[in-house]
């Protein structure tokens, strides 16, 4: 499902108490702008246009294509962030069901879901500058942990997301956008902490659990 298809409803109504429709439209416009920049960079470097994840991997270790990496990586981050939210038309209770399966691992890693929330809010709020905060899982250690990446970088290139960089170190399960454009419209310059707190209430734990279960299947 494309970014446009997934968020057609959100463009009209926003994300409940998390993001207004105006904020969603601004993020959507920025996403489209990035797609235009990706196409431009592909022409400059005579690179066949592919999905952002492929372009990100291809350009990650090439300084001459740093712009292509940044633009495509940010698109990957956008998609992962929004796909982890409860859709506007879906009851929140349905999206909480996945938390049941995650609870034993979360409790072992953080103490409780409440402590995970507290750490994500505090760590995310303390990030200086633009970036992303990730919940990741280590199949080797059977532990969940937090990871901060800055600017357009992401957790996929640290872990199992793409074969070229496969290390089995970590698997991204969830992320929150910490760039100012994500929260400035609705929360203001000093509203990042409230933005992250509201985001927590919009997490689709069923999606997160599906990502987690996929790592367990791969390890068999």
From Swiss-Prot:
One of its GO terms (biological process) is mitochondrial translation. GO terms for cellular component: cytoplasm; cytosol; mitochondrial small ribosomal subunit; nucleus. Keywords: Mitochondrion, Ribonucleoprotein, Ribosomal protein. Pfam families: Sod_Fe_C. Its main location: mitochondrion. It comes from the Eukaryota. SUPFAM superfamilies: Fe,Mn superoxide dismutase (SOD), C-terminal domain, Fe,Mn superoxide dismutase (SOD), N-terminal domain. It is found in: Mitochondrion. One of its GO terms (molecular function) is superoxide dismutase activity. Component of the mitochondrial ribosome (mitoribosome), a dedicated translation machinery responsible for the synthesis of mitochondrial genome-encoded proteins, including at least some of the essential transmembrane subunits of the mitochondrial respiratory chain. The mitoribosomes are attached to the mitochondrial inner membrane and translation products are cotranslationally integrated into the membrane. Component of the mitochondrial small ribosomal subunit (mt-SSU). Mature yeast 74S mitochondrial ribosomes consist of a small (37S) and a large (54S) subunit. The 37S small subunit contains a 15S ribosomal RNA (15S mt-rRNA) and at least 32 different proteins. The 54S large subunit contains a 21S rRNA (21S mt-rRNA) and at least 45 different proteins. mS43 forms a dimer with mS42, building a large protuberance adjacent to the mRNA channel exit in the mt-SSU body. Belongs to the mitochondrion-specific ribosomal protein mS42 family. This is Small ribosomal subunit protein mS42. The lineage of its organism: Eukaryota, Fungi, Dikarya, Ascomycota, Taphrinomycotina.
């Amino acid at each position: 499902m494309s970014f446009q298809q997934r968020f057609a409803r959100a463009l009209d109504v926003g994300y409940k108490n998390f993001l207004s429709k105006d904020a969603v439209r601004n993020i959507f416009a920025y996403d489209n702008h990035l797609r235009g920049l990706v196409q431009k960079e592909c022409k400059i470097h005579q690179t066949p246009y592919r999905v952002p994840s492929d372009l990100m991997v291809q350009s990650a270790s090439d300084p001459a294509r740093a712009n292509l990496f940044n633009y495509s990586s940010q698109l990957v981050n956008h998609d992962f962030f929004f796909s982890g939210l409860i859709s506007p038309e879906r009851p929140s209770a349905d999206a909480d069901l996945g938390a049941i399966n995650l609870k034993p691992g979360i409790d072992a890693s953080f103490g409780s879901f409440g402590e995970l929330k507290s750490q994500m809010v505090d760590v995310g709020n303390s990030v200086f500058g633009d970036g992303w905060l990730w919940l990741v899982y280590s199949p080797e250690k059977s532990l969940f942990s937090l990871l901060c990446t800055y600017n357009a970088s992401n957790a996929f290139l640290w872990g199992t997301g793409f074969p070229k960089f496969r290390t089995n170190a970590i698997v991204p399960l969830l992320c929150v956008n910490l760039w100012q454009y994500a929260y400035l419209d609705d929360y203001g310059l000093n509203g990042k902490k409230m933005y992250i707190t509201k985001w927590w209430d919009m997490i689709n734990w069923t999606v997160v659990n599906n990502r987690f279960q996929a790592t367990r299947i791969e390890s068999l």
